[in-house]
Amino acid sequence: MGFLLIKPWSREMMANIWSSVKLNRLHIEATIIGIAFVLEGIYHFIDQDFFEAIVPTWFRYATFANLASGGAEIVLGLMLIIPKFRRIGAWGLLLLLVAVYPANIDMFINDVDVQTNALGVVERVVDAEGVRLRNFIRLPFQFLFVWLVWRHTRKQPINFSGS
């Protein structure tokens, strides 16, 4: 008869289940974000001309900026996927997002577009038609990425079992 006094869904049990769901959701989110950064980083090496054209003209080392940021995206994206290195990877990605933000501002201010000319050469086009709105929309999206990554800088238990 005593077993009837045990609540099958106690608050503690529900809290453990919810904690597990929340941790699993954050793990899945970090994995998706990490994979996105890894793929974007790889793309820096595949389409170097495109990414070098995005680098503001006042920064003289476009090739270095492209390869360094692409390499950082790969390494930090992988770190975000691995729970043991997630916080460090997230902090690194935050710094990277802040470092590349001036390129987004430059693209908006100067109406920059990256186009392929008739000879098949990728080039940076300043005062391009019809890009202002697109370049403006990129600016707040960077803050969304910062927020998504920032969520993984906080100390979290790595116990995904819910126990």
Q: What are the functions of these language-model segments?
A:
Residues 2-163:
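Membrane-interface extramembranous regions
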